């Protein structure tokens, strides 16, 4: 056994080094950056903190409690967990979180980054070893150039993507085997794993594979078509095998806001120089950007030289050079053409993470460069003279970049790139002068390449930054105690009044309303906006609640921290550690019967107070809940109003940004509970003062704000600072409203009388009873989803969407038992396809094995 291990280590030492060297490097970075357990920091930056970590917490709880994987009530009033799992969490490597406590989750995920990046280096090295035909140091260098390129470093926080990058080299080697040996098993399984782990990034891989196959050097037309059928067949088979994940994921993502087709109108983003400069040594990795033309392209200066060398040498056929070049040029154009980028991104906008498919270009460039390197090491010494063509080409490209770049080019990156080229050229010169033997020369340039890549990775992770877990998770223990005490079932909803992370309530697995994620339903986002909550493209937060919407959504508790200054209508319950619990003064329920008139509800008005008034009136037959309070025109500074509709909407132009560009003043003529709502996309910051004292500040637009119990004579001032950008104009719409407390009491009483009584809640199944006074609509504060099956007294009934967002059913007069069961749409069909796919691949493998045995017998 020992000898066998020694043989493996000897035969595969460089392949193993391609994994362990990045691990050592990245763990060294972790120690230097004080990543847990070496400190309190974490690699979980940007959305990894605000989205992915909370989703992992929900997943971990499900794994440990063996809860249903179909649905979760821990976000968004309830969401399709399987759809979200397929988008963010499906990698088998993520199952490691079931082995650790929640307190270790941030640490485990930080080091899972390390493992996944190292595996990307390993699979790339495996591919290059197969191309080279031997185990040598070059596979380590080029493998690390892939796994530690600026794309991987900058976007490493997208931990759910890494398996797709990891599988790409294996998929491409699988295509080689499929074409050359007519064996598609590796290709099929590698693509299956990629599709299973992240269907969205795998979609980009699939587009790339079509191009790769079309430009592959086929022997003849017949081979092109026969292998094409194999390629298509195994591709479809891998999709079928992953269908149990793909179908629910696809159907879920098609319900999001970003699912609407809207092709960009621009022709170009920028210039050649803007893009190519991102190849330069010393460029800072991009973690996120609003500008869709931004990109991560650095993958080594030796890569550029060897790619140029590939184009120059005579040992490679011209047609092969043209094929490789066409692929790279098309990908490069795709970076700069909005329409092509839109297609590459699955007909979706890029939303702050531009050019996500750049890893395909990087690997294609590295593959081309490695072919050039192989020619160099296999050829005679004089072949290396072609490197001067590569240097001249790089010089021309650098010159064009400096000439055409419209963004400020950091000259230090130009100097560093030129210096790196010079160092490599010295090595080539020493080799050409016969001072270095080939073995020493190739080892030296590969060593320098490793150093270059490692140095850029160290710099990149330092630039990325880290997050201090102590500051973000200091209240976890206290909130966990609150949850244990008060969150009795799914009907008990509670929320943080403000989160340190956008999805912090999900991190604590509270039955909450907040959801920030790519799988958020577009119709629900739109509805929450209409009701006065803060929303974004793929988010709706618990910011903007009123007593009515709190009751409607069954919000029973709010959690405050010392820094929270927002007013609340809830009553003080108790303090636990550093947090304070407030309780809704009204009884709430997960569902209510409503008058059939609710189907005429006008939910499309721009004023959320009107929307809530109409819902309360049509559903529960009460008078006007909110009375609009007239507000005076704002005072203006470095700003002018160009249009006024007389209803609180002002079109403006500003000449500068100052804290008091617009100042609205409300003087209360009586004691009342006052609310405001304003929309203003061009508002940079807002300060709200009450009698000269600041009570709220920050991003306060696009949500209802409760200003407390305002006394007669109180003065409210709303100061708005406008943005100083290219637009310098926009629209501000402000409305103030008074809550009618008598109507609210009557409304709460009627809602309690119409409440559905929950009797059982297990996983994806709910049941309860309702007593309808007449034929009515039963409204659930649960997002509408075709995956819900509702039965009344054991009989399945048709579900409908109120306002295109909420689950409702018609219920006849009398007392009834109502049960709900959720199964993700597409799961059953996907499971059937997956079983069929695995049966087919097993039959193919058995047939192949029998065929091999028959061939051996004939010999």
Which residues does each predicted region cover?
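Active-site-proximal, structured, solvent-exposed surfaces of multi-pass membrane proteins
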Residues: 3, 8-9, 633-859
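Hydrophobic alpha-helical membrane-insertion signals
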Residues: 7-79, 465-477, 481-506
């Amino acid at each position: 056994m020992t000898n066998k291990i020694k043989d493996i280590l000897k035969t595969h030492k460089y392949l193993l080094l391609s994994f362990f060297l990045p691990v050592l490097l990245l763990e060294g970075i972790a120690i230097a950056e004080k990543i847990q357990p070496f400190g309190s920091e974490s690699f979980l930056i940007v959305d990894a903190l605000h989205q992915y970590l909370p989703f992992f917490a929900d997943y971990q709880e499900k794994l440990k409690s063996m809860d249903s994987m179909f649905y979760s009530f821990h976000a968004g009033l309830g969401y399709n967990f399987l759809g979200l799992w397929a988008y963010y969490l499906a990698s088998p490597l993520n199952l490691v979180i079931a082995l650790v406590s929640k307190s270790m989750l941030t640490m485990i995920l930080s080091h899972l980054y390390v493992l996944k990046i190292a595996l990307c280096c390993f699979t790339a090295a495996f591919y290059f070893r197969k191309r080279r035909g031997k185990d040598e140091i070059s596979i380590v260098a080029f493998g690390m150039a892939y796994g530690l390129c600026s794309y991987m470093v900058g976007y490493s926080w997208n931990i759910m993507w890494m398996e797709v990058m990891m599988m790409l080299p294996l998929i491409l080697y699988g295509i080689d085997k499929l074409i050359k040996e007519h064996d598609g098993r590796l290709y099929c399984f590698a693509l299956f794993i990629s599709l299973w782990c992240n269907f969205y990034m795998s979609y980009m891989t699939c587009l790339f594979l079509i191009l790769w196959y079309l430009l592959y050097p086929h022997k003849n037309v017949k081979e092109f078509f026969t292998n094409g059928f194999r390629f298509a067949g195994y591709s479809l088979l891998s999709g079928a095998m992953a269908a149990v994940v793909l179908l629910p994921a696809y159907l879920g993502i098609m319900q999001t806001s970003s699912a609407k087709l809207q092709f960009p109108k621009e022709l170009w983003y920028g210039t050649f120089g803007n893009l190519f400069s991102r190849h330069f040594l010393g460029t800072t990795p991009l973690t996120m950007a609003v500008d869709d033309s931004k990109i991560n392209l650095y993958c080594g200066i030796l890569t550029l030289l060897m790619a140029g060398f590939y184009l120059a040498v005579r040992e490679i056929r011209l047609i092969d050079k043209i094929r490789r070049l066409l692929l790279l040029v098309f990908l490069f154009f795709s970076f700069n053409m909005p329409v092509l980028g839109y297609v590459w991104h699955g007909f979706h906008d890029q939303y702050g993470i531009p050019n996500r498919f750049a890893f395909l270009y990087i690997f294609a460039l590295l593959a081309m460069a490695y072919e050039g390197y192989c020619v160099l090491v296999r050829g005679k010494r004089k072949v290396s003279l072609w490197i001067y063509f590569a240097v001249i080409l790089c010089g021309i490209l650098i010159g064009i970049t400096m000439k055409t770049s419209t963004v400020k080019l950091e000259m230090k990156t130009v100097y560093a790139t030129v210096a790196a080229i010079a160092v490599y050229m010295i090595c080539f010169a020493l080799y050409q002068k016969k001072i270095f033997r080939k073995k020493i020369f190739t080892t030296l340039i590969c060593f320098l390449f490793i150093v270059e890549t490692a140095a850029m990775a160290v710099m990149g992770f330092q630039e990325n930054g880290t997050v201090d877990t102590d500051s973000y998770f200091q209240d976890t223990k206290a909130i966990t105690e609150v949850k244990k005490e008060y969150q009795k079932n799914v009907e008990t909803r509670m929320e943080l009044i403000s989160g340190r992370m956008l999805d912090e309530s999900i991190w604590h697995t509270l039955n909450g309303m907040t959801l920030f994620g790519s799988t958020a339903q577009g119709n629900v986002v739109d509805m929450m906006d209409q009701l006065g909550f803060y929303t974004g493209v793929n988010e709706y937060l618990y910011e903007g609640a009123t007593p009515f919407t709190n009751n409607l959504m069954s919000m029973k508790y709010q959690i405050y921290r010392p820094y929270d200054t927002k007013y609340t209508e809830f009553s003080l319950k108790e303090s636990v550690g550093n947090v304070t619990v407030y309780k809704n003064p009204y009884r709430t329920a997960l569902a209510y019967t409503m008058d059939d008139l609710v189907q005429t509800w006008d939910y499309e008005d721009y004023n959320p107070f009107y929307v809530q008034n109409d819902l309360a009136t049509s559903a529960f037959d009460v008078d006007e809940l909110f009375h609009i309070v007239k507000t005076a025109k704002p005072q203006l500074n470095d700003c002018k109003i160009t249009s006024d509709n007389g209803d609180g909407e002002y079109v403006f132009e500003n000449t500068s940004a100052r804290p008091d560009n617009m100042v609205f003043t409300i003087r209360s003529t009586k004691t009342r509970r006052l609310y405001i709502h304003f929309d203003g996309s061009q508002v940079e910051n807002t300060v709200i003062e009450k009698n000269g004292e600041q009570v709220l500040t920050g991003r306060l637009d696009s949500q209802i704000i409760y200003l407390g119990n305002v006394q007669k004579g109180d003065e409210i001032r709303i100061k708005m600072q406008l943005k100083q950008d290219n637009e310098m104009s926009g629209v501000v719409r402000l409305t103030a409203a008074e809550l009618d407390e008598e109507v609210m009491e009557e409304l709460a009483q009627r809602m309690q009388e119409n409440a559905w009584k929950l009797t059982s809640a297990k996983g994806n199944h709910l049941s309860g009873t309702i007593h309808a006074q007449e034929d009515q609509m039963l409204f659930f504060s649960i997002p509408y989803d075709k995956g819900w099956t509702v039965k009344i007294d054991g009989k399945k009934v048709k579900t409908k969407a109120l306002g295109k967002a909420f689950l409702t059913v018609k219920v006849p007069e009398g007392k009834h038992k109502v049960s709900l069961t959720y199964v993700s749409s597409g799961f059953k069909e996907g499971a059937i396809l997956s079983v069929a796919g695995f049966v087919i691949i097993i039959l193919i493998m058995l047939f192949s094995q029998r065929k091999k045995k028959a061939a051996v017998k004939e010999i």
